[in-house]
Each structure stands twice: as C-alpha cells, then as structure tokens.
C-alpha cells in the first residue's frame, strides 16, 4: 500500500472515530431527558385518570400517537429543521431569540414580540429544569417497589438522597465522570431496545401501531378524551428542546445521527415492548417499564435507570447554567459569579445561585408530589410551552432569515403551530391538577428577567438626562486644562457620546486627569462569539482622550484587561501597574416618575444591590479599581 493511501486510510479512520465519539457524547448529554421518558409515559397514560382502557384498541391507539409524535415533533421539527437554525453553531431558546431578534430588526413590534417570547421560553425552561430531575429520579427509584414489597415509604427519601447529592457535587464539576455519561447512556438505550424486542416478540401485533390509522381511530373512538390524552403522550417528547439547546457542544450532524441510528429505534422498540406487556397482562399498566423486564433483570434495570436519570438531570442542570450565562450576557439577568469547573472545557461552568435555587425547587417538588405519577401532571405545561415558543420564533427565522417562499413557509409553519398548540391546549387543564408549579415558576422568573431588562433601560435613560456631551467636555479641557498625572485611566460607560459620571466625579473631587483617558464601552452581541478582528474599535480624540469599544458574544467571558492588551495602538499603554479602572456604582431610588410600577422599581433596586458588580464580571484587578457612587431616581 502506498504512503498516500496509508495516510488517507488513517485520516478516514480518524474522522470515523471522531464522528463516533461525538455521537456517543451527544447521546450522553442531549438524550438523557427524552431517553428516560419510557420510565413513566405509558404508566401515566393508563393510570393517570384519563379513562384509557388497557385493551387492544387502546394500547395500539396510544402507541400510534406516541410513535407519530416522535416522528413529527422530534424527527421532523427539531432534528431536521430546528437544528438548522443555529446562531453561529449555538442553539437553545436564548440563542434562537437572539437570531430571530436580528432577523426582525426592521420591524419594531415584531422585535418586541421576539424578546418577550424568548423570555417566556427561558422562564419555562427553568421550570422544566426543576421538574425533570424530580420526576426522572423518582420514577427510577420506584422500580424498587416492584422488586421488594413494603419499600413504598423509602422511595421519597432515596430519591432525595440521590438528588441532593447531585446538586452538592456541582461545585466540583463533573469533568472526570462526564466521560462516562456517553457510554452509560449508550448502554441504557441498548437495554431499552433489548427489552423492547423481548416484549415485541411475545406480541408482534403491536407493530401495527406504526400505521397512523390507529391514532386516527383512537381519536374517533374516544371523542371525550382524545385531545386530553395528548397531555400524557407528550411526556414521550420531554427533552426534545435539549437536542437544540446542546447543539453548541456537538454540532448538528452528530446529534441527528445519534437520534436516527440509536435513540429513536430504541425508544420506539421500548414503547412497543411495554405495549406488548400490557396486551399480555392489563395489570402491567401500573408500571409497564419495569414489568417488561424479566425477573432476573429487574434490579440491574433499577440501578441502570437511576444512573440514566442522574445523567439526564445533570444535563438539564448544566443547561440551566448555560442558559443563565447567555441571559446575563444579553442583559436579561443580573450578573452572577460564574465558576469554571474544568480547565479544558469552556462550557463546563457552575453558578451557585442557580444551583441552590434549582435544588430547593426539586426538593419541594419531591416532597409535595411524592410520586412520579403525581408529578407527571405538572410536567407537560412547561414542555409544551417551550415547544410552542420555539415554533413561533422559528416562524420569524423562516420568514425573515431563511426567506422561504410563502407557498412553502406558511403551510409548514401552520402545521407546526397547530400541532404544538394542540399539545399545549391538552396540557392547560393540568394547571388545576398540579401543573401550576411550572407556570408560577415561569411567571416569577419572567417578571424578574423583564424587570431587570426594563430597569437597566430606565437607569441608562435617567443617567443620560444629566449627561454632558463628550465633544463639549473635551473642548472645555482644552480651554482650562487640569493637572495631568502619569498613567492610563479607563472609565467604563454605556454611552459612546457622553462623559461617564465617574469621570466627572473624579475630576470634581480630585481636580486631576490621567495622561491617557480611555472611555470604554462593552457591547454584548447577539452572536455567540466575536472574531478577534472585530473585538475592538479605537478612536483617538486628541489631548490624551480615546474611545474604545469592546465587543463580546453571549457565550464569551468578558475579560477587559486581556482584551485591552490586544489593543494595538502605540499611544495607549495598558500595562497593569499603569492602568487604573474607574467604575460607577448606582444606587436606585424608586420614585413616582413614569417608568415602572413602584413594586417593580423596588424589585429592580433589590436586584441591582445584590448583583455582582463590574469588578468581578469584567475580571478587573482588585488593586487597580476605584468605584464612585451615585444615586439615581427611576
């Protein structure tokens, strides 16, 4: 064999092993949530009080609904289309919102709608982030009730031990054990498929459910509960949004390949196997997943299920951290301390406030609902709400960004909207039955995010009212030049045409200016990352005054000193011991001025007081920072 052929073969093998590695990684991170849905979906359908009979027509009808829901919602909508709506490789409701906002830029009202829709989607995701760990781990531990009599009272304590332990280790990171997530989940899906084949062999007639006629016939024979049952079958779709949210880690192709080659076949086989078990014994509907397993495999499946649900919960928690970082960068959430838990993976982060809030919510859910069957009632609202928001934002992308022809875009969008609206409507009655929790959590988080965003806008407007134009200030410095001291002073400001308040206060009290005065503005872009050649803009005004604008993406850490060192301008010296950073810290005073309701102004003042300041957020050196305070009425 020639050297060229050998190198080509090695390259091919390298690409092949890399592709397989990405697929395995995607299975471990992206598919944990939807992969653990078989633990509770069919159980909820048949014992959740919907009135579905565990007979031949009922089982085949439900299986057909689940199968075609997986095909349309996950395979067609998410894997084939939504994954293509990446924001420079990043996905998720925040990234999609930023993408749609750029596309809707010429239309003010549409842009406002996109912002509000993105905030609602993000708020519902946080509610989902609490429910997923609770219902997944509870459903896994409940398998012990099948294996051993009298363990019902131990289900909740065991689930709490697992969940609290999971949240406690977040601060230390999961880099070391994270490499096992993919192989464990591959083993999990292999077990799902094997159990499914075991069940289908006993009742091959369940394969008839692939015919959509059974789903249509089910609606026809159950006119009273046909739509309501969608509220239970949607549990099979939980985690579909995670495929899109985690796209930045693996890319579209590995996620799509993992779905079609492993995850979808394993899920379909397992659901059909559970259906076969119910056809053989209607009593198996009380927990068809575990009763599908042979007796000798029950305890191993409980152990594997617990591992799989922990991995699924970890993926959701990590997703909440990532979403929070994006929201902070886009200006929707107060600044928090972000801790990196891995020196190799930039995306592995820890946000203490989010972690403890999620833990409290999860513990309250487990204590309040006590079983996966009870908790299933609260699950669908957040899931279908987020799916509906994604469809609405996708409509903007299809129209304004992809510019599909109307004859193609309108029918496709209408079908997506109709399906998601049907699922969402089917879950609305759950608000009364226990589904109020994610709705309340979503409302609270939406109020917090919208109040912070609006409060920041009002704060900038109030500061602008008393601002001095930069050109006037520089002209006055030429007429009456103050004493200049050595070094570089960097003043952070949101305005590019006005004098920062910190500069005016410093000049008023100290009567001096540095040799070099830099007015620095940080701009957070709607894209995930900014290339080095677009990182900064520099403008020299003369007399030692400079304007610098730094650009950061919503997936980047805004390190100002590191960015300024790349500012190649001979006149500027940003050496650490010659540079002083001046910050302005505002204290907000609620007033009767037109802006927000007084209670929202008070809430914003509280959030601003407890938010991390610019010092930590921008990685400024502690011994080179001077903060100057000012009071502002909003």
Swiss-Prot record:
InterPro entries: K+_transporter, K_trans_C, K_trans_N, Kup. It is found in: Cell inner membrane. It comes from the Bacteria. One of its GO terms (cellular component) is plasma membrane. Keywords: Cell inner membrane, Cell membrane, Ion transport, Membrane, Potassium, Potassium transport, Symport, Transmembrane, Transmembrane helix, Transport. The keyword Cell inner membrane applies. It catalyses: K(+)(in) + H(+)(in) = K(+)(out) + H(+)(out). It is a multi-pass membrane protein. The keyword Thylakoid does not apply. One of its GO terms (molecular function) is potassium ion transmembrane transporter activity. The chain crosses the membrane at residues 19-39, 62-82, 113-133, 150-170, 177-197, 225-245, 259-279, 291-311, 349-369, 379-399, 406-426, 431-451. Pfam families: K_trans, K_trans_C. Belongs to the HAK/KUP transporter (TC 2.A.72) family. PANTHER family: LOW AFFINITY POTASSIUM TRANSPORT SYSTEM PROTEIN KUP, OSMOTIC STRESS POTASSIUM TRANSPORTER. Transport of potassium into the cell. Likely operates as a K(+):H(+) symporter. This is Probable potassium transport system protein Kup. It comes from Pseudomonas aeruginosa (strain UCBPP-PA14).
């Amino acid at each position: 064999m020639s050297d060229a052929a050998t190198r080509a073969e090695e390259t091919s093998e390298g690409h092949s092993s890399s592709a397989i590695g990405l697929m395995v990684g995607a299975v471990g991170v992206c598919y944990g949530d939807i992969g653990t849905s078989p633990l509770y979906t069919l159980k909820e359908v048949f014992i959740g009080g919907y009135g579905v009979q565990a007979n031949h027509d009922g089982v085949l009808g439900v299986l057909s609904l689940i199968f075609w829901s997986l095909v349309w919602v996950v395979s067609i909508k998410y894997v084939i289309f939504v994954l293509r709506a990446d924001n420079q490789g990043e996905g998720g409701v925040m990234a999609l919102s930023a993408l749609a906002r750029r596309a809707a830029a010429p239309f003010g009202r549409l842009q406002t709608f996109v912002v509000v829709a993105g905030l609602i989607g993000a708020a519902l995701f946080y509610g989902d982030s609490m429910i997923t760990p609770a219902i997944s781990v509870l459903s896994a531990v409940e398998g012990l009730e099948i294996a051993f009599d009298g363990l019902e009272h131990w289900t909740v304590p065991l689930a709490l031990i697992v969940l609290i332990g999971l949240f406690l280790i977040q601060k230390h990171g999961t880099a070391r054990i994270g490499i096992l997530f993919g192989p464990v989940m591959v083993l999990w899906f292999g077990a799902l498929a094997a159990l499914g084949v075991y069940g289908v062999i006993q009742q091959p007639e369940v394969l008839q459910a692939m015919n959509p006629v059974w789903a249509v016939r089910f609606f026809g024979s159950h006119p009273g509960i046909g739509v309501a049952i969608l509220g239970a079958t949607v549990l099979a779709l939980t985690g579909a949004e995670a495929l899109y949210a985690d796209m930045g880690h693996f890319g579209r192709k590995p996620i799509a390949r993992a779905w079609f080659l492993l995850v979808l076949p394993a899920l379909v086989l397992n659901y059909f196997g559970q259906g076969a078990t119910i056809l053989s014994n209607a009593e198996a509907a009380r927990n068809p997943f575990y009763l599908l397993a042979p007796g000798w495999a029950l305890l191993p499946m409980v152990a594997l299920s617990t591992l799989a649900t922990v991995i699924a919960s970890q993926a959701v928690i990590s997703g909440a951290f990532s979403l929070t970082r994006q929201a902070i960068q886009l200006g929707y959430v107060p600044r928090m301390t972000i801790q990196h838990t891995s020196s190799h993976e930039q995306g592995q982060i820890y946000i203490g406030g989010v972690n403890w809030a999620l833990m409290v919510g999860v513990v309250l859910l487990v204590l309040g609902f006590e079983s996966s069957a009870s908790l299933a009632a609260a699950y669908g609202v957040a899931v279908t709400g987020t799916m509906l928001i994604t469809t609405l934002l996708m409509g903007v992308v299809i129209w304004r960004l992809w510019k599909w022809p109307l004859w193609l875009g309108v029918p496709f969008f209408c079908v997506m909207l109709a399906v998601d609206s049907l699922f969402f409507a089917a879950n609305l009655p759950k608000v009364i039955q226990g589904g109020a929790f994610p709705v309340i959590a979503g409302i609270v988080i939406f109020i917090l995010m919208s109040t912070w965003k609006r409060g920041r806008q009002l704060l900038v407007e109030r500061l602008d009212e008393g601002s001095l134009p930069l050109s006037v200030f520089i002209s006055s410095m030429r007429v009456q030049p103050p004493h200049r001291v050595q070094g570089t002073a960097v003043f952070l400001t949101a305005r590019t045409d006005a004098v920062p308040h910190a500069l005016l206060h410093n000049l008023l009290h100290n009567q001096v200016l540095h040799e070099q005065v830099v007015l620095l503005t940080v701009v957070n872009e709607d894209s995930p990352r900014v290339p080095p050649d677009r990182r900064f803009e520099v403008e020299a005004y003369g007399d030692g005054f400079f304007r610098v604008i730094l650009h950061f993406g919503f997936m980047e850490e805004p390190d100002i000193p590191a960015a300024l060192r790349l500012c190649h301008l001979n006149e500027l010296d940003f050496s650490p011991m010659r540079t002083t950073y001046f910050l302005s810290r505002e204290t907000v005073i609620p007033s009767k001025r037109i802006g927000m309701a007084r209670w929202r102004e008070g809430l914003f003042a509280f959030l601003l007081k407890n938010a991390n300041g610019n010092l930590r957020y921008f990685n400024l050196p502690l011994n080179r920072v001077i903060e100057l305070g000012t009071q502002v009425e909003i």
